[in-house]
């Protein structure tokens, strides 16, 4: 009887071990499925992040190229406007110079006319004066 109890106990223990082993294998297999699912989920997120990072890098390079292009264009515009401004200043200088020359020419003309009138004989002066008054 005792030996039968021991034998039954051992048989029961062996069945429990086998059941535990089967359950352990099932748990490991299901953990593998869960782990693979988690890894796929994480990898999908990582792949999406990686793709977004590549897009950002491409956009950053494009932005940098456009910034350099616009910076160059801006510098060209600044140079062009500076040249235009200098040309306007030169035109203003020429205008002032021409007005000064014109004023000097009027002064010289007035002086020559004055000298001409004063150097003529006194007889011609009365004839000249009425002409000046008409002007």
Curated annotation (Swiss-Prot):
GO terms for cellular component: BLOC-1 complex; cytosol; lysosomal membrane; mitochondrial intermembrane space; mitochondrial matrix. It comes from Dictyostelium discoideum. PANTHER family: BIOGENESIS OF LYSOSOME-RELATED ORGANELLES COMPLEX 1 SUBUNIT 1, BLOC-1 COMPLEX SUBUNIT 1. GO terms for biological process: endosomal transport. Component of the BLOC-1 complex, a complex that is required for normal biogenesis of lysosome-related organelles (LRO). May also participate in the coupling of lysosomes to microtubule plus-end-directed kinesin motor. May also play a role in intracellular vesicle trafficking. May negatively regulate aerobic respiration through mitochondrial protein lysine-acetylation. This is Biogenesis of lysosome-related organelles complex 1 subunit 1. It comes from the Eukaryota. Component of the biogenesis of lysosome-related organelles complex 1 (BLOC-1). InterPro entries: BLOC1S1 (IPR009395). Pfam families: GCN5L1. It is found in: Mitochondrion intermembrane space; Mitochondrion matrix; Cytoplasm, Cytosol; Lysosome membrane. Keywords: Coiled coil, Cytoplasm, Lysosome, Membrane, Mitochondrion. Residues 1-27 form a coiled coil. The keyword Ribonucleoprotein does not apply. Belongs to the BLOC1S1 family.
